[in-house]
Amino acid sequence: MERALGVGIGPLAAGTVGLLILLKVIQRLRRRPNIQDKVVVITGASSGLGKECARVFHAAGARLILCGRDQRRLQEVVEELGNKTYGKTKTYTPCTVTFDLSNTSVVCSAAAEILKRHGHVDVLINIAGVSYRGNILDTHVSVQREVMETNYFGPVALTQAILPSMVDRGSGHIVVISSVQGKISIPYRSAYAASKHAMQAYYDCLRAEVDSLGLHVSVLSPGYVRTNMSINAVTGDGSKYGVMDRTTATGADPVDVAKDILKAVCQKKKDVVMAGLGPTTAIYLRTLWPALYFRVMASRARKQTGKEE
């Protein structure tokens, strides 16, 4: 009896192990980035995280349409990418469309120009944005509007201009690079946090509304990333902040974040927080123990004077 049982268990165990190995292989194949030949639009592509995403998506074989305000800098990115090869991966020379995302009156014409390039868009990645540093008491409402125009109304206008073509094809992927501050708010970031919260809400609604149409929506929320975001941030009077925050200087490498974005896009992730333990804990704390979270933020505000600690 025992011998017969042993004989039966052996093949069963081997079969189980084989099945597990097969499942692992299938999972790896599914996780492998596959953006080859897809038409990918990237806003804010002339610098920072947008530029790194341009490099990463180009290396993966995407047909890029790079967008930004500065044609010269966009062309520099195109020339840089045009001189690179990536083994057997077929790559394409990116094209560019120059416009100011904060000027929503030109976004529709820019979207039409984008669609002319390849006839359609597979993936729209909204990265362009502006940060803010300031005390609410000293911040003019015009500055609040400026941040909202760039970070919220601009991406929304571009999304709504591109969206009908995706609906007609029954295929498309809208991606927005939000922030941990779209989940929680910290002192002296009011305009920025408000714009990112608005973005989170809008694209959550959009995801539900287009789900039955074959479209995908991803909200990706990094923590601090080592770019010039804080240097270029606006202050309460509209002037540039001009300082590299300590938290920004020690933030994540934009190359690594860009690779994570590629992976999330290929896997069609719906909502991803790309941050360390501290910010992630704060997000959960805000939901599960708000009273403590509010005390922590009040304490942080008292230790600051409108500038990064």
Curated annotation (Swiss-Prot):
- Its membrane topology, per UniProt? Single-pass type II membrane protein
Q: What class of enzyme is it?
A: oxidoreductase
Listed transmembrane segments: 6-26
Mostly located where?
A: endoplasmic reticulum
Keyword Transmembrane helix carried by entry? yes
Locations listed in the record? Endoplasmic reticulum membrane
Annotated Gene3D superfamilies: NAD(P)-binding Rossmann-like Domain
Q: Signal peptide: which range, if any?
A: none
Q: Which UniProt keywords apply?
A: Endoplasmic reticulum, Membrane, NAD, NADP, Oxidoreductase, Signal-anchor, Transmembrane, Transmembrane helix
Kindly list the positions annotated as binding substrate: 179
Active-site residues annotated for this sequence: 192 (proton acceptor)
Membrane side Lumenal: residue ranges:
27-271
A Gene Ontology MF term for this entry? oxidoreductase activity
Q: GO cellular component annotations, sorted alphabetically?
A: endoplasmic reticulum membrane; membrane
Q: Which domain of life is it from?
A: Eukaryota
Known EC number(s)?
1.1.-.-
Q: Which residues lie on this side of the membrane: Cytoplasmic?
A: 1-5
The UniProt record gives the binding positions of NAD(+) as: 47, 49, 192, 196, 227
A Pfam family recorded for this sequence: adh_short
- What is the recorded function of this protein according to its Swiss-Prot or TrEMBL entry? Putative oxidoreductase.
- Give the family, as the similarity comment puts it: Belongs to the short-chain dehydrogenases/reductases (SDR) family.
**What's this protein's name?**
Dehydrogenase/reductase SDR family member 7B
Q: Which organism is it from?
A: Danio rerio
